A protein has these predicted regions:
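Glycine-rich beta->alpha junctions and the first turn(s) of the following alpha-helix
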Residues: 1-83
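Hydrophobic packing residues in well-ordered alpha-helices of helical domains and bundles
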Residues: 42, 68, 75-78, 107, ...
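Predominant activation on well-ordered alpha-helical scaffold segments within soluble catalytic domains
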Residues: 46-54, 76, 86, 90, ...
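C-terminal helix-coil-helix/basic helical segment that borders enzyme active sites and/or dimer interfaces
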Residues: 57, 61, 83-117, 127-138
Length: 183
């Protein structure tokens, strides 16, 4: 994940001809590609989380606090959060990129859950890092401040409640056990 900025572009006066148009009406939001593609930004989130995790480990080594039991517990919890995010991303990518094995609705449901699981794991990891490092993690030029700020911003993807309820709506009527729900 790289530092980013938000801005605006003015396309007033730019002519768009028929040869400039890609695809057809409705292509952009066609499922499962639209929602299913969300695994890609979840992968970026996981990358930001990995960077933050590495910065935490470096901080603990540099300060000699890595053996403190409270710091070790937070580092262990951070490792769990990071691995959780990576596992969800990997499975969401498989579901979305090999769609023939699953229905469109199943793909959308799974990727929606994955993006929310990664968001939760990212928020948890940031809290653990901030608690471990303390005030330094909020002050520039500490790299933890920048990575945390970027990750916190990018984790906020649109429609999280809709993503969750859409997934739940697919899950409810499924006539299989939890073990077979995503197979």
């Amino acid at each position: 994940m790289k530092a980013s900025a938000t801005g605006a572009l003015d396309f007033s006066g730019v002519a768009v001809g028929p040869d400039d148009i890609l695809g057809h009406d409705g292509d952009y939001e066609r499922q499962p590609y639209f929602s299913g593609g969300a695994w890609r930004f979840a992968a970026v989130h996981a990358g930001g989380m990995a960077r933050l995790f590495d910065l935490l480990r470096a901080h603990l080594r540099e300060t000699g606090r890595g053996q403190d039991p409270h710091q070790a517990a937070r580092l262990g919890q951070a490792a769990i959060a990071l691995e959780t995010a990576k596992l969800w991303v990997d499975q969401a990518a498989l579901a979305a990129e090999e769609p023939s094995a699953r229905s469109t609705d199943a793909i959308v449901a799974y990727v929606n859950l994955a993006r929310l699981a990664v968001e939760r794991a990212g928020l948890d990891l940031m809290e653990l890092v901030h608690r471990s490092v303390g005030l330094q993690s909020f002050i520039r030029p500490n790299p933890i401040e920048r990575v945390s700020r970027d990750l916190a911003t990018y984790l906020r993807q649109p429609g999280p409640d809709r993503a969750l309820t859409t997934a739940a709506a697919w899950i409810v009527p499924q006539a299989v056990t939890a073990q077979d729900l995503w197979r």
